[in-house]
Regions:
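Membrane-integrated ABC transporters
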Residues: 1-45, 64-72, 90-94, 126-162, ...
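Hydrophobic/aromatic residues in alpha-helical transmembrane segments
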Residues: 49-56, 90, 94, 109, ...
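Hydrophobic alpha-helical interface/terminus motif in multipass membrane transporters
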Residues: 53-57, 113, 213, 217, ...
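Extended non-transmembrane interhelical loops and adjacent amphipathic helices
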Residues: 1-18, 99-145, 226-274, 345-358, ...
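Cytosolic ends of transmembrane helices, especially the final helix of ABC transmembrane type-1 domains
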Residues: 299, 318-357
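Juxtamembrane/interface segments at transmembrane-helix termini
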Residues: 88-101, 206-226, 333-346
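Conserved A-loop
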Residues: 382-386
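Transmembrane helix-loop-helix hairpins at lipid-water interfaces of multipass membrane proteins
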Residues: 33-86, 160-214, 305, 309-314
Length: 387
């Protein structure tokens, strides 16, 4: 793949990902259904435990009624057991249909090969395109494989955001008592809007930094696949008994040693990827993590200040902190996933370039119309008869 073909707009990237997801659904609908079911279930269930735990803590800090505490604890334990049971079933369903996913993807590509006109199949450009798709798939999973991972993450983060927001809205609408004096300013809509704006800005900034780090791997896709080819050949050359004589006569083990033991290899300590990790990629990822900690600090301070003034009880603190940090991680994950989808789009474009190769030759059967004004002549060549 040419490195100058890396720039794809977000709109086109989303269209390519959506088309790829529909392609999966056409071939493997139960795989998609099992994936979505487990994703939604895993996104919703944490909030059930958060809510029930908050009720237990609130009761322990309040009336301390033994009957109510016993009831809440029983409900929490039964809910946890039920969630675990259903999760195990959904995971088994998904694992069953996800087994051999690499072969499932290759089936989609191979069906196109079998359906292709021979002149296109025999074209070296077609086979180079197919080989490039397979290499990117076998390496970092670029192309169709990452589509499933990205949509799973996007679906999970989306439902998690919806549930989290429904539990955190009251955090910003709850009023601080007027006896709190200076902290009453937190009731001001302008102050609340400013705090939300800062949280949104931090939430957006963190995954954007992580996305910039991910772009370095896209730029290195050609080197990645080339290094995999070198390793696949020279790393196993010594085990090929058919080439053992050539290895000894021409001392080819020195060539293998050069490629297998060199620390300048892209995957080794002095290679390109190591330099990325020590340089720009490491910087962007560290900055992304630092920004996420800033958000956590702001969330804790805001929630604890409102609880300190008596806006809500200790149980609500647990609920709000858990929910708001969950919303933050989900929004960050959603933005990060969209960045990954845009990075993956260039490889999907390559895949669909292969799948969209037209079949110009006629496929099927042609009938010959028999007419009285036409004379047909049938000639047999190299025909034998057996009685």
């Amino acid at each position: 793949m040419k490195t100058n073909e890396k720039n794809i707009s977000l709109k086109e990237a989303l269209q390519l990902n959506h088309r790829a997801y529909k392609l999966f659904y056409r071939y493997y609908p139960k795989l998609i259904l099992s994936q979505i079911s487990l994703t939604i279930w895993k996104a919703l269930t944490p909030y059930i435990i958060i809510y029930l735990s908050a009720l237990v803590i609130e009761e322990l800090a309040g009336d301390r009624s033994p009957d109510r505490i016993r009831f809440l604890v029983t409900i929490t334990l039964l809910s946890g057991a039920g969630i675990s049971l259903i999760s195990a079933f959904l995971k088994k369903w998904k694992r069953t249909w996800s087994a051999g996913l690499g072969m499932k993807i290759k089936r989609i590509l191979c069906e196109k090969l079998f359906d292709m006109d021979y002149c296109d199949l025999d074209d070296s450009k077609t086979m180079e395109l197919y080989s490039s798709i397979i290499q990117n798939l076998n390496g970092p999973g670029w192309g169709l494989y990452n589509v499933l991972l990205n949509y799973e993450a996007l679906c999970s983060e989306g439902f998690s955001i919806i549930c989290g927001l429904s539990m955190t809205i009251s955090l910003f609408t709850s009023q601080i008592p007027k006896t709190a004096e200076k902290l009453v300013i937190l009731n001001n809509p302008v102050c609340v809007t400013a705090i939300i704006s800062v949280m949104v800005l931090i939430t957006w900034f963190s995954p954007v930094l992580a996305g910039k780090a991910g772009k370095y791997w896209v730029r290195s896709a050609d080197l990645h696949t080339f290094s995999n080819r070198l390793f696949a050949y020279y790393g196993r050359l010594g085990y090929d008994s058919k080439k053992a004589a050539d290895m000894r006569i021409y001392q080819q083990e020195k060539i293998c040693e050069k490629h297998n033991l060199s620390k300048e290899n892209p995957f080794c300590s002095k290679g390109l990827f190591a330099r990325y990790g020590k340089g720009p990629v490491g910087f962007y990822m560290a900055a992304s993590s630092a920004v996420s900690v800033i958000f956590t600090g702001i969330a804790y301070v805001f929630v604890c200040l409102k609880a300190w003034t008596g806006a809500f009880g200790i149980g609500a603190v647990t609920k709000y902190i858990s929910s708001i940090t969950k919303v933050y991680s989900s929004v960050s994950g959603c933005i990060s996933t969209i960045e990954d989808m845009q990075n993956n789009a260039v490889f999907l474009k390559q895949t669909f370039e292969f799948l969209d190769i037209p079949n110009n030759m006629y496929q099927g059967s042609l009938t010959t119309e028999k007419r009285s004004d036409r004379k047909y002549e049938i000639e047999f060549r190299n025909v034998s008869f057996r009685y």
